Amino acid sequence: MAPKAPSSLPLYEINYRKNYISRGIELFILFLLFSLLAYRFLTLKYHGLQWLLALICESWFTFIWILTVSAKWNQVEPKTYPPRLLERTCNFPAVDIFVTTADPVLEPPLITINTVLSLLAVDYPANKLACYVSDDGASIVTYYSLVEASKFAKLWIPFCKKYNISLRAPFRYFSGNSSPPQDSSQEFQQVWIRIKDEYKQLCKKIEDASTQEPETCDVAGDFAVFSNIQPKNHPTIIKVILENKEGVADGLPHLVYISREKRPKHPHQFKAGAMNVLTRVSGVMTNAPFMLNVDCDMYANNPQVILHAMCYFLGAKDEIDCGFVQFPQFFYDGLKEDPYGNQLKVLHEYFGRGIGGIQGPFYQGSGCFHRRKVIYGLSPHEKITAGGLKDEYIKKTYGKSEKLSTSIAKTLLEGSNIIEQFNSDSPSSFIDIAHQVGSCGFEYGTAWGQKLGWLYGSVTEDVLTGLFIQSRGWKSAYCLPDPAAFLGCAPTAGPATMIQQKRWATGLFEVLFNSKSPIIGTLFGKLQLRQCMAYLYVQLWALRSIFEVCYAILPAYCLITNSYFLPKGKYDQKFKTTQS
């Protein structure tokens, strides 16, 4: 098919909110804070300890407010145009999709397969998609669930695309609907009932497998590799579940199961280690120029999500403006009034849009599209020629694998075509090589986790990796399609929320004292000053409670000591004079 005529209309637009009133209010508050600090400082010698504590706390609050105002100053209104992209081209670049799961108990396989099904059914040529599922728990139930889901996918995906179903996660599509829409055709109603029955059977099989693992999963057949293994002590397991051998656009995408090798004496580096294995395995199997990573509980809510991301990648005037595309994390079935703040609505609405107008949003660990060459450590405008990419350098930096070296060279070389970069061969023909790059000892002596890939050194590997990318000069894009691109489930109980927020606070604070901290990135890298301030705003989250608690107990302390920490007005002074 001949390429379509190029259109002069932009694939995306970024407008800025006219938030002049809110800016004025924020600056006025900042003026009041500075006035209070000046008064505190000038009168400090006339007061005691409580005055000094108030000065310290209020100085902290002023500093945080400066970071807040800076981050919210330029709020963006991004807009993408997938129809224009479809008019412009019919030959799209390939995308490798990464879905990560680690515990079949905390992350039930039924949730994982719904995420996978929603991603396999997106509006994008199937011969340009490959979905890799990383199972860090090496669970036979997870693998069995994916095998059964792949059978259901042969019915579900054609059904979604034929009838243009907008919600393509089965558990959400069928929830609350006991019968098909009455205003639909007779044919649709019959197919709807059949698909729902098939999905019920799929759910029952997975639930039975979860409670009766050995009986349901035939350990003597394709599941033999899972026998007598432990989640933290097993060899690499790679299974090609679905394969689009014919390379047809309206078929089913590749689906590959991966459980990387784990040994007790080898650090596995948690999710960052799993993501690096996915990057290498996909590099030797399909080598798509773009990669999407999604948590197993974040299903694709918008079937055109990849087209929205491609509007940025293919529409950017300069690659530096789009190192990665981040979709905000929204959630379904949250508690009314959101008492724990798990929905993060205010953060996305103001802070997310604000940093979108600086150097771009942070990498949030899910719902993010990456350029493969950026993950491989390439800096903006860095040009690598065939003569400048020595085989010895590739093996020392990326690992000793001929096939991986070839795919990396194809990705990094200047002028490489992103369409031709994709490996159209069958993934099953690279199983042995994939086992090699998925082994736990492959990274030793290389730059994985240090200068390329997902970085090690923090439990919030996503923020650290995104910070390192932006410190090299790359910008990121904030994409807000309607409906939301991805929806996930947030904790609904207090203890679970505290555990999650403790992990976030600890990990973000770790990054602040990392060798790749935002301050280092600004002083010695290409991280913009206001972007550094935005990173500081979130990374200092763990310290805020100290000053807030201290300030909160000052009134009680003053009552006990018969003192005061708030400035007295004229009325208070007049009242005191009258009393005396």
Q: What is each PLM-predicted segment?
A:
Residues L480-A496:
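Active-site donor/metal-binding and catalytic loop motifs
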Residues Q501:
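Acidic, metal-coordinating helix/loop segments flanking the phosphotransfer/catalytic sites
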Residues M1-K475, L487-G488, A505-I520, F524-K526, ...:
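Glycosyltransferases that elongate glycans
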